[in-house]
Amino acid sequence: MRFQGDAALVRSRVYGRLEIQMSSTAHNLRCTECGTSITPDAVSSNFRCPICNGLYEVCYPWKLRAAGPDSNLPNASALRWLWQERRSSNLAIDQSGVWRFRDLLPILQNPDNAITLREGNTPLYDLPRCAKAAGIDWLLAKHQGMNPTGSFKDTGMTAALSVAAERGFEWVACASTGNTSAAMAAYAARAGLRSIVFIPEGKIAWGKLSQSMDYGALTIQLKTDFDGCVAILADLVKRFPIYLLNSVNPYRLEGQKTPAFEMVEQMDWQVPEHIVVPGGNLANSAALGKGFSEMQQLGLISHVPKISIIQAEGANPLYRWYNDTNRIMRPVTADTRATAIRIGNPASWRKAADVIEQMGGWCEQASEQEIALAKAEIGAEGIGCEPASAVTFAGLKKLVAQGRITREERVVLILTGHTLKDSQYTIDYHRNELLTDAEISQATPAQRAQHAGLRKPPMVLEANPDIVLRTLETHMKLAQVVQPA
């Protein structure tokens, strides 16, 4: 890329045009329901609009100017150059895949106050065998499970917790199905803040629970579900000076929009036709939609992708809303082994619904056996993910079968969590101890054959080389007969 003048001059021009946006008045908060706009210091402790109880989104001056003929927006080419240049920096803030794009999230009075674990910069994997199984030519996976604490929550937590630290809070808290608590506890520890985690007793994976304890959080298990934990915490933040870090906090979404920037940068600023996202509390879908929309407003991309959201059949309030002719959101009692999306009353459902409607995607659901099969198929690619992530591939196969996604479309799955987040699920699957008879009965003959071929239970043998050799010979002969898809 060629510019007039030397690199220092280009850098000066880029920073000069963005400098005003890095001040404390560079953004406001707008209610997504009634449109009321407030300053950041006027927001309530529960991040709800006092007029309509809606959620806020962060708005910037350049978003308002984008519609005008004389917008004076930052130069898209210069921004791309600047973000690439930061990759060679030794500064922690530049090595972060979130704060490297800080020009598009000026939420701190001083960017040097960012609390970072060098999150982001996650890989974009090619999935050729999964693409073939789904009936499409081109499939990638943006693996957010490769973040420091193993999930996409890190990208949002670095942003929101940095705001909490800069504003002088000592205590932070969240309700969680596991990933949010792990991320919050880690970033709070990094910042020297005290953290409180509320989790539903017996309803999150042990690997996630161990993280919040290891990072020093006060971990409280409540005899309720996730939505019950949210209600308790919402009451507590009104009584004590605790900074709420659930996804109702709009600064979480500012960090969680950055994988959209990373994705198109990794694709040489080309936009895939379709993004498929798992749906739990639904803030991630909303954040990605915001990221793509802002890139289009700034001229970084020419168009936005479709975004489809997939939910577990046992935790599917958005899917039910999507298929309800009256479009009424009705909370459900969530029940799925994909614990990260075991949420029956998602806080960000309206934002996510807007993303589907505005960007032209769909909402689907996947059964427990479909999720388990999809997880095993992704694992067979050498990638791996937690169960909630696999719902994307299960849903993709349905969307292709329905003709909603065509063979030629470029599709990206958002994998939100690492496979080690719920290792017991994986062990139970391969030992054929995960699914019930009723769940297995829902599988087609082809799906049952796939399950049988993908399960790899450990074998226990006598410590005898002849026995081991005979077993290996038998296994190798079978492997030649049953070739992987």
Model-flagged regions — what are they?
Residues 20-485:
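PLP-dependent amino-acid enzyme catalytic core
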Residues 1-21:
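N-terminal amphipathic/basic-hydrophobic helices that include classical n-h-c signal peptides
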